[in-house]
Amino acid sequence: MSFPKGFLWGGATAANQCEGAWNVDGRGPALTDVKTGGSVNAPRLVTYIDKDGNPHAEPESPRGIPEGAHYAVLDDYLYPNHDGIDFYHHYKEDIALMGEMGFKTFRMSISWSRLFPNGDEEVPNQKGIEFYRNVFTELREYNIEPLVTIWHFDTPLYLEEHYGGWKNRKLIEFYTRFAQTCFEEFKGLVKYWLTFNEINNTVMFLEMFGNKASDEDYQNAYQILHHQFVASAKAVQIGHEIDSENKIGCMICGITFYPMTCDPSDILLNRHTWERGIFYCGDVQCKGKYPTYANRLWKEHNVELEILPEDLEDLKKGTVDMYSFSYYMSTVVTTHTVTDIVSGNFSAGARNEYLQYSDWGWATDPTGLQYYLEMMYDRYEIPLLVVENGLGAFDTVEEDGSIHDPFRIDYYRQHIQAMDKAIQNGVDLIAYTTWGCIDLVSAGTGEMRKRYGFIYVDKQDDGTGDYSRSRKDSFYWYKKVIASNGEDLD
């Protein structure tokens, strides 16, 4: 194996999926707090009250909720993010388990509304500051390097309702204040930062709607992305000014796309899919300017961006230090008519007969990870981090309390071997954090039974459970992997 000395092995979570304590110690509600539970066959619902006072629960839409309506938590619905896995009260126990595994890093996010309950305040909530300072201090006690995502899908609800969310340029100001507060308050405790989680999902989400997405939807999506690009660039500049030791990266939802056939139209579609879905966000954040093909993407949907002259200067000055991404699966694109369509992780495509699929329809493709790593390093030539990778699966607790998950071990083994091949081919890969190292609420379906962790959490989809933690077989396996720096994968 060729993993470099000092390689950052660890795991990843997100505040809205694990913390719980959604209305504790001054935290305000976030967009994720009005999403119900769901399943692979039933979408999560967003709940709201319309202008006439009538309650509604509908699948999430890129258009948000109707004009005059307001988000609401309704009776008779289960909101799994409200409690998460109660990391807020279990963080010491959880970090001790990470320390036992030998984690070198732990990727987590900071809940914007825990620091700024509405999002537009000028002074942060000190209870929130204290919580995160305690978490980072605890991680340091175990020599675990925090890797912190500043925004992970959880915009404060107040900003959505009163400003229209990221469609409003004012959110650049509010976000940069939030980011600056994080950089200042946690200086010396955190040096690895990611500005926006899976920033490209704004457009990927629209692709899932196909022809149902209008030009107006694309106009809003690309304007949202522009505001987030500028906010990210400003945050990078602020973070470097506050602490020259800070390393700040982007975070992309990574999917490897393949053409279904060698039909030239499939080859061209595949290239354009990479540009629209993956390269667009990476190019702006890593190269500091919009790529030439951006004009084609905008023209496809009659998009006319509002870009200020100073925005372009900020993009140039605020390029990221490193490129991080999630990787779970690959997908197949084609111009031909196909009937066997599989979807997952903000993408849909033809079934790949050469791959196996999970119970949630996600293709297992470690070679796709190697392909992605080599392509991105060749394109950007900055350090890469795989900050999400994992297999959502059913776990069974045996009578003696043991949890055998050889399928999860095999999944990770294959993907670690793929990373090793990429490193041998010259890729500068510095970190690997498995997704959901401890079981948590699924962002896509709101389920607990879709489990990723090395650590089992006794919480079920109906909200029952005592939140106790248990080690799975994969816990001991990953501990061995880390101790050997990737040498021992048996």
Descriptions of predicted regions:
Residues I110-P124:
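Glycine-rich, proline-tolerant flexible connector loops at the mouths of alpha/beta enzymes
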Residues D76-H90, K167-K170:
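Active-site mouth loops of central-metabolism enzymes
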Residues M1-D75, E100, N118-D120, I129-D490:
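Active-site region of glycoside hydrolase catalytic domains
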Residues G84-G99, P117, G128:
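Internal amphipathic alpha-helical repeat/solenoid segments
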Residues H90-S111, K317-Y323:
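Catalytic domains of carbohydrate-active enzymes, especially glycoside hydrolases
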